[in-house]
Amino acid sequence: MGAAWAQTFSWGTCTVEVREPIRPAQRVLVLLPGWNYSRRCWCDSSRVCSLALAKGYRLILVEMGKSIYASDVFPETRADWRHYPTLRTLIDTVFPALLEKGFLWSGRSYLLGLSTGGRGVVMILAHTGRLFRAGAALSGDFDPHLDPKDRLLTGWYGPYGPRWENVDNPLSLSERLQVPLFLAHGQNDPFVPHLHSRRLYQHLQKKRPDLTVVYREVPHAGHDFTFWEQAGEWALEFFESL
């Protein structure tokens, strides 16, 4: 099922596209792309958008470019990456604008992200309380200790150091989560090891046993839309179960 209509806005450094379902929207789904993916990647490369529209979700697509959902731009951030949106762009500019226009509904909105966008889901939920009803992070990177030389992290934060550990560490920030979380990762992921999601799940089991967290680790699955389409469907089922 397609959208009844779509509108595009520019807020701060972020382009945002809103797609309305044919029937009146019942809830909102914010779709987060991975590093250097188009905001429309979910819709162009999977059935997730059409399935969500058919279920009555309003879709919000955000253009993040080469963002890693860092809290801010730092002195060490690569010059050619500085103009991309950050976590602060979303929290201080984009989400308030969406709320003001009535496109984002507190308590009836959900987050779904793939790859770096999965990291973004945890970063956003850690800073927004109960604005969102739940989140789903697919193939995300959460534990900076797994690869201290990661080129995306060093490109934003500089060499491994206190900032990785104390400022933008999704693993530790996850302890702040106030809403349910769905995690999924392929065991054959060649880009983001599945240990990222496994460690996050284990960390939350230990630190936040009160939090609803579901983790699906999938044998033979990789870092691609074959997996993300299936896991995206699971995420929608998870949201509907709450």
Please state what every model-predicted region is.
Residues 1-242:
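Non-catalytic cap/lid and distal C-terminal segments of serine-dependent acyl enzymes
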